[in-house]
Amino acid sequence: MATTRKPRGGAGGATQPALDFDAPGEIVCGVDEAGRGPLAGPVVAAAVVLDPARPIVGLDDSKALSAKKRERLFDEIVVHALAYSVASASVEEIDSLNILHATMLAMKRAVEGLSVLPTLAKIDGNRCPMLAIRSEAIVGGDALVPSISAASILAKVTRDRMLVELHQQFPMYGFDAHAGYGTPQHLAALREHGPCEHHRRSFAPVREAFDLIR
C-alpha cells in the first residue's frame, strides 16, 4: 500500500484554518475510490481537503470527464488543495477481505494520510469506513460535493497510471486500454493466457480462468 500526501502549510504546520467551503465551521475532506469493479489491480482511494481561497474550476465526477480533463484537474488539485492523500488496498487484501472491506480500508488509509486533520469526512456512496472523525455517506457525492469530485479524480488518475505501468509488464492483457475491467478483450486474454498475480482471484471471471488452466 502506497500513500501520497501534500504537506501541511504554515509555520511548522502548527495551525489549521477553519474552513467553511463545504460546511460552516467544519474542516471537510471528500473521499472517493476507483477500481471496485475491475478484475485486476488494486482499489485506490483519495481524500481531499479543498482550499476555499483557491477554487478549482471544472470539478466533477471523474467518470463524466475525459482523460485529458482528468489529468489537467489532477495537476490543479495537487497544487491548490489544502491537503490530499491517495492510498490503496492490494489485490491480496481484496481477495482476503472482499472488495467492499478492501475499499473501506483504502478510504480509511487515505483519510488517515491527510496532513490536515478534518472534522468531517464526506464519503461517496452509501457506506462509510470506520474513522476517528465523523463521516457522512452521500450517494452520487462525486457529482455533488466538490471535495468528493476532487477525490474521485485523484483516485481515478492514480489508478489508471498504475494500470498503464502494469501493462508494461503484462502487455498481453491490454491493461492500458481497459484498466483491468472485464471487457471482451480482457476476458479473451484471460482465457488465452490465464491470470497473472495482479488478477483478483475472488472475482468469478478470474476464478473461471484459473480453472481453465488447471
UniProtKB/Swiss-Prot annotation:
Catalysis: reaction(s): Endonucleolytic cleavage to 5'-phosphomonoester
Pfam families cross-referenced by the UniProt entry: RNase_HII
PROSITE patterns: RNASE_H_2 (PS51975)
UniProt domain RNase H type-2: residue ranges: 26-214
GO cellular component, one term: cytoplasm
Subcellular location(s) of the protein: Cytoplasm
Biological process per Gene Ontology, one example term: mismatch repair
Residues holding a divalent metal cation: D32, E33, D124
EC code(s) of this entry: 3.1.26.4
Transmembrane segments: none
Main localization (coarse): cytoplasm
Enzyme class: hydrolase
GO molecular function term, any single one: manganese ion binding
Cofactor binding, note field: Manganese or magnesium. Binds 1 divalent metal ion per monomer in the absence of substrate. May bind a second metal ion after substrate binding.
Cofactor(s), by name: Mn(2+); Mg(2+)
UniProtKB keywords: Cytoplasm, Endonuclease, Hydrolase, Manganese, Metal-binding, Nuclease
Superkingdom of origin: Bacteria
Protein family membership: Belongs to the RNase HII family.
Protein role: Endonuclease that specifically degrades the RNA of RNA-DNA hybrids.
HAMAP family: RNase_HII_B
Protein's name in the database: Ribonuclease HII
